[in-house]
């Protein structure tokens, strides 16, 4: 099963991606994770990515496609995978098609931008484990500290309101053509494409997705 999970930053893609990959035993391929891994390596490409993201810009198609292409070719993807945060542009979608990889499902989470801003700007992260909290919806037991380790929580560099607004503008600019592309693919019966109300609870969304993937 090959799945693409679409949605603007802050729509809950990461949460649903984790649930889907656990249920169907397929690897999650996250653009964000791959980019952050390269930033942590502090190599040439990592430094370039860091400078782009801290300004709220999108990493170029060439860089992202090369990194995702390498990951998809690994053995654990033979029986399927979930792409989280990729593609973000029509060119990236065409790149997947050119790799002769058949996508079975495209799922898109829809959330109003006002709610997205509240979600992202309230986000706090325990960097070593990747655990994520939200001061509005899922606060830690002790303010500013991870529940398990009591270590300090941090705010991602790109989670400020100015940068989030810029990321949403970039997403909106690219999503129109991307949506048209997948609607066309759906009409040609090459894949199934569903839009999901991301304002619902995590578990309602999860149940809805299970029905779609039957």
Curated annotation (Swiss-Prot):
**What are the GO BP annotations of this UniProt entry?**
AMP salvage
Q: What is its EC number?
A: 2.7.4.3
One GO molecular function term? adenylate kinase activity
Q: Name one GO cellular component term.
A: cytoplasm
Chief location category: cytoplasm
Pfam name, any one: ADK
- Give the family, as the similarity comment puts it: Belongs to the adenylate kinase family.
- Protein known as: Adenylate kinase
Native species: Buchnera aphidicola subsp. Schizaphis graminum (strain Sg)
């Amino acid at each position: 099963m090959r799945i693409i999970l679409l949605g603007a930053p802050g729509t809950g893609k990461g949460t649903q991606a984790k649930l889907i990959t656990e249920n169907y035993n397929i690897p999650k391929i996250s653009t964000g994770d791959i980019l952050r891994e390269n930033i942590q390596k502090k190599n040439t490409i990592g430094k370039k990515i860091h400078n782009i993201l801290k300004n709220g810009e999108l990493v170029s198609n060439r860089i992202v496609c090369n990194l995702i292409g390498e990951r998809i070719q690994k053995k654990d993807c033979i029986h399927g995978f979930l792409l989280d945060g990729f593609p973000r542009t029509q060119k990236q979608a065409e790149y997947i098609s050119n790799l002769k990889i058949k996508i079975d499902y495209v799922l898109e989470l829809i959330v109003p931008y006002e709610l997205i801003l509240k979600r992202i700007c309230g986000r706090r992260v325990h960097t070593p484990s990747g655990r994520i909290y939200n001061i509005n919806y899922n606060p830690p037991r002790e303010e500013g500290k991870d529940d398990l380790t009591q270590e300090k929580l941090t705010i991602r560099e790109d989670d400020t309101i100015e940068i989030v607004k810029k990321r949403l503008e970039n997403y909106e600019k690219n999503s129109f053509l991307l949506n048209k592309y997948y609607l066309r693919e759906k009409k040609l019966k090459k894949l199934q494409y569903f839009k999901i109300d991301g304002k619902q609870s995590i578990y309602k969304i999860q149940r809805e997705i299970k029905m779609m993937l039957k």
